[in-house]
Curated annotation (Swiss-Prot):
Belongs to the TRAFAC class TrmE-Era-EngA-EngB-Septin-like GTPase superfamily. EngB GTPase family. One of its GO terms (biological process) is division septum assembly. Transmembrane segments: none annotated. It comes from the Bacteria. InterPro entries: G_ENGB_dom, GTP-bd, GTP-bd_ribosome_bio_YsxC, P-loop_NTPase. Keywords: Cell cycle, Cell division, GTP-binding, Magnesium, Metal-binding, Nucleotide-binding, Septation. Its cofactor is Mg(2+). Mg(2+) binds at residues 37, 59. This is Probable GTP-binding protein EngB. Residues 22-198 form the EngB-type G domain. The keyword Cell cycle applies. It comes from Neisseria meningitidis serogroup C / serotype 2a (strain ATCC 700532 / DSM 15464 / FAM18). GO terms for molecular function: GTP binding; metal ion binding. Necessary for normal cell division and for the maintenance of normal septation.
Amino acid sequence: MNLFQNAKFFTTVNHLKDLPDTPLEIAFVGRSNAGKSSAINTLTNHVRLAYVSKTPGRTQHINFFELQNGNFMVDLPGYGYAQVPEAVRAHWVNLLGDYLQQRKQLIGLVLIMDARHPLKELDIRMLDFFHTTGRPVHILLSKADKLSKNEQIKTLSQVKKLLKPYSDRQNISVQLFSSLKKQGIDEANRTVGSWFDAADAAASSPKEN
């Protein structure tokens, strides 16, 4: 089953106080222009569920989409886009950071990186920041179609090696992904689906006194 199929827009917020009361959430985040919106549209099989723009930094709010299992997918503002006023960028940083650290419904993070330029400084800072929550991270190396088959294999191997220090501390996984070639959809579904399954199992387990 495609977990993301038939996802529908729910609401958009610009302040933590306006966050909706939801059951469980997984969030998508990445550098501006890393292909986050295209990845969301590909996973949901929807042409314009998330707005795709040639201008980086287009996602400026926290956008909520309801999944068919009743849980939610959250599209977070991209990071690393400098051509906005300092006050606006500071608001994005605070909004993003506070959501990732404080949101109790958040069960995992999907981090989008351009396969041609993975693990840039801000990506590493995001991993360092989020790992303190103990929640899982799944990395989509987007735009994999821009690489040859051999380059894809090499890049995936290198990224896995660089992620070893993180994977020792938390559940972290990585895969190749291409919106153009529809590559990696099933793998992303299985990984994120396992997060929801684990959260549901934990919620239904008897609590110890």
